[in-house]
Design a protein with these regions (language model features):
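A motif-centric signal for short, conserved binding hotspots located
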Residues: 27-355
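C-terminal segment of classical bacterial N-terminal signal peptides
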Residues: 16-24
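Bacterial N-terminal signal peptides that target proteins for export
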Residues: 1-10
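N-terminal leader/presequence-like segments
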Residues: 5, 24-25
Length: 355
């Protein structure tokens, strides 16, 4: 029996090693050893970045896997670079190498206002102890995933378990309806959307992310599933509440006290100004990757034009900001503070009468 058990064990290990050295039938691409290590030992050296074993037999963590320089050829999105990324005026130019979320490089270099201070990348913000616009419930430093992060399940404290089933069961070809983590936009649990296959490396009006937004009639509507509702988990009063965005019952028809989000520009009182979005006339305007808008259309048909169907000109947080970071104050997409002497006025894409 002992010899039989030993042979069975040997065959099991051999089978596992064969799996790890060959193609792995998962949604992630490449061989399994690109991400996993069986024993954290190879040729008398440890395999993991830290030297210690990681959860789920991973070679690295979120930051380690997503640190590098985007070239347009890499299949894994890099959101942090150890060298200055190429951003240019808006981060969308042909000579830029950042993605839709921007890059953590600047905030990791000690520039607090240039991005989110994620644990492991940047020190806690020297000025802000709580997220601006927050209700005080989020206490502690932001992480990539888990209960203190943006990605994965908010019910899991640890980052790796929070992403369980995400990478292996992701199907990028379908509308991400938020019903499961694997079916959530960019592993942002419950958030809907349709992602560009190259993560907006050199985006155009014909190739970009499709962000989900909701045209609200009241700020009490939390707009579940929208990309802006994700931001509102930490920055609540910039998105929803009571008299936080517009006083009383005048949401969309009266005076704003904070910039609206999850609101369709076609419903604005001065809608004629916004009908000129990105140089258009109010019908079939070209989509802007510099100042993008969200849509309520939940299909894989890309929104290459705006003012084409109902609720397709929805202002969102990402119309102005990069989620990870940028070289500009407040993680803005463009250098508004340098305008008009220099920089780019992305505000003018929507506010056409004020440029």
């Amino acid at each position: 029996m002992g010899k039989k058990t030993g042979l069975t064990g040997l065959l099991t290990v051999t089978a596992l090693l064969s799996v790890l050295s060959g193609p792995c039938p998962a949604r992630v691409t490449g061989v399994c050893v690109n991400c996993h290590t069986m024993h954290n030992s190879q040729n008398n050296f440890t395999v993991t970045d830290s030297g210690s074993p990681n959860q789920a037999l991973l070679v690295s963590d979120c930051i380690g896997c997503h640190t590098g320089q985007n070239t347009g050829i890499n299949t894994e999105p890099y959101v942090h670079d150890t060298n200055p990324p190429l951003y240019s005026a808006t981060g969308t130019e042909a000579d830029s190498n950042t993605l839709a979320g921007g890059n953590f490089y600047w905030v990791s270099s000690g520039l607090d206002r240039m991005g989110h201070n994620v644990e492991g990348l940047a020190a806690p913000d020297a000025t802000l102890s709580l997220p601006p616009g927050g209700d005080g419930s989020f206490v502690g430093q932001l992480r990539c995933a888990g209960s203190m992060g943006c990605h994965g399940s908010r019910l899991e404290v640890e980052q790796i378990p929070a992403l369980k089933g995400g990478h292996h069961y992701k199907d990028h070809s379908i509308w991400q309806d938020g019903s499961t983590l694997a079916k959530s936009y960019r592993f942002l649990d419950t958030i809907q959307g349709f992602g560009d296959s190259s993560y907006e490396y050199h985006p155009t009006d014909l190739r970009h992310n499709k962000y989900y937004g909701i045209d609200r009639s009241a700020e009490s509507d939390q707009a579940a599933g929208s990309i802006s509702s994700l931001c509102a988990r930490c920055h609540k009063y910039f998105h929803n509440g009571t008299d936080s965005v517009a006083p009383g019952s005048t949401f969309g028809t009266g005076v704003w006290i904070r910039h609206p989000t999850d609101f369709d520009m076609s419903n604005a009182t001065s809608s004629s100004e916004y009908q000129g979005y990105n140089g258009g006339s109010g019908t079939g305007n070209p989509y802007s990757v510099i100042s993008p808008v969200a849509t309520a259309d939940a299909s894989t048909t890309l929104n290459t034009t705006v003012y084409t169907r109902a609720n397709d000109a929805v202002v969102m947080c990402l119309s102005c900001h990069r989620a990870h970071g940028s070289p500009y104050t407040s993680s803005l997409r463009w250098d508004y503070k340098a305008w008009p002497a220099g920089g780019y006025n992305g505000c003018g894409v929507c506010h056409t009468s004020k440029d």
